[in-house]
UniProtKB/Swiss-Prot annotation:
Residues 1-70, 206-210, 257-270, 319-379, 432-437, 510-512, 560-594 are cytoplasmic. This is Solute carrier family 22 member 14. The lineage of its organism: Eukaryota, Metazoa, Chordata, Craniata, Vertebrata. Ubiquitous. Residues 92-184, 232-235, 292-297, 401-408, 459-488, 534-538 are extracellular. It catalyses: riboflavin(in) = riboflavin(out). It comes from Homo sapiens. Glycans are attached at N99, N117, N125, N150. PROSITE patterns: MFS.
Amino acid sequence: MAGEENFKEELRSQDASRNLNQHEVAGHPHSWSLEMLLRRLRAVHTKQDDKFANLLDAVGEFGTFQQRLVALTFIPSIMSAFFMFADHFVFTAQKPYCNTSWILAVGPHLSKAEQLNLTIPQAPNGSFLTCFMYLPVPWNLDSIIQFGLNDTDTCQDGWIYPDAKKRSLINEFDLVCGMETKKDTAQIMFMAGLPIGSLIFRLITDKMGRYPAILLSLLGLIIFGFGTAFMNSFHLYLFFRFGISQSVVGYAISSISLATEWLVGEHRAHAIILGHCFFAVGAVLLTGIAYSLPHWQLLFLVGGILVIPFISYIWILPESPRWLMMKGKVKEAKQVLCYAASVNKKTIPSNLLDELQLPRKKVTRASVLDFCKNRQLCKVTLVMSCVWFTVSYTYFTLSLRMRELGVSVHFRHVVPSIMEVPARLCCIFLLQQIGRKWSLAVTLLQAIIWCLLLLFLPEGEDGLRLKWPRCPATELKSMTILVLMLREFSLAATVTVFFLYTAELLPTVLRATGLGLVSLASVAGAILSLTIISQTPSLLPIFLCCVLAIVAFSLSSLLPETRDQPLSESLNHSSQIRNKVKDMKTKETSSDDV
């Protein structure tokens, strides 16, 4: 308490010395440095009531144990990105033609061009048709060349891909001529697995613990990721992609929960940002491997092999002490904390361990119904669901927009992924200087600006939305790609702030459940994007991006700030902390007036 009084005295002395400047600046009663000092004081007050923060200080805020934990927790994010975006690289193929090898029986020395010219009908523009062929006739080669073939039909013996340099799912299962929608089916199956995985793993994470949820999700990546390489039918491929999506979302929920509950203050923010950087590295790694491998099965084989070393997590990954306490496992929580302290070469004072008891020795219980009963929890869930819906819708809309512009699949992935790393690192500065709430608002505001610019840039190769007399179409197309890249930059920052902010807003007893419920909105956003783009002009999807970003920006103002605040443990913890901070601000204002 003496330290607090000295701290307050320092604040009052600085306030008195700058009293003249305060009156000169209307609407700014404190200078920036004074605001920083006040924020530190509020952090001291709130931290005193957080037993786990004090314990983690004694353990070592970010010692060897925490550094190892962050590395172990987020390195698998590389493989999550690998399997999440793999579909984009296994559905590529050159234009196919009907298999007309029957003519080689009468003309074995025909070149590929001569074979196509004799057996495949042509479109009015001179290109060969993909889905039709001339029916075979019992003639010799000279008669076929002299009289030609006239009777056409659909392909009888499959297709050939004369210009294909790689073996993809398209030429593996002949997904052409009415089967092109199978590609969208694969994407829909992957998206369908996300909400189911969210529901399954939020139960596992909150009921069984963060540690078993992480192990189960990694096991799913090994089984479904490695097994995909051996699928001999497209339906089995869809089933395994469905399983992979559940594992990916399960790992995201459980890993963020574990890292959030082991770290304090800005270390928590830095760890989640680092995890998202690993995710971007995974997307770049996928692009490089997919570019170099000639077969789609090899891609999944390599991915499955890279996940196998994570089996060792069974012996080296710890459980969350916060979750153990919420489940009444005080002894196990103390053991985990003491082990962490020994790794960091620290000693936890016995009085701190003795304070680690449950209030009235009752186990904290919560259910999904609390998201409806608790007003604050309901508000947080709805607002964050709106933000996640906006992010998902915008991501898929812009990805399809890039494809419309004729950008190669490798460029569409590697460049935005590289840009994501500095975007996420910039969040460190934002989160430290302006907090979680305003960081989310700033990134959403950037999204609004870039979407508005897209409304006035060219629609694609067929024409321009507005007349730009001094700019050729190629330059306008380049401008559109640049704006899309900048929008990806803002989107990456929004996702990073979103995950950290959401994890800090939700209480420990329902953190994984809340993350799972919020992630359901991403599926709805993706489905809406795919539906609108396939049925409406290109102007409406971008316009909806602007509208949704404005709505999310407005709703974000309803959320409380979590910077320098302890993690919520129970359903009423957040309201208690806010009341204490409000009382402290009132006392500070009263002392300033005196």
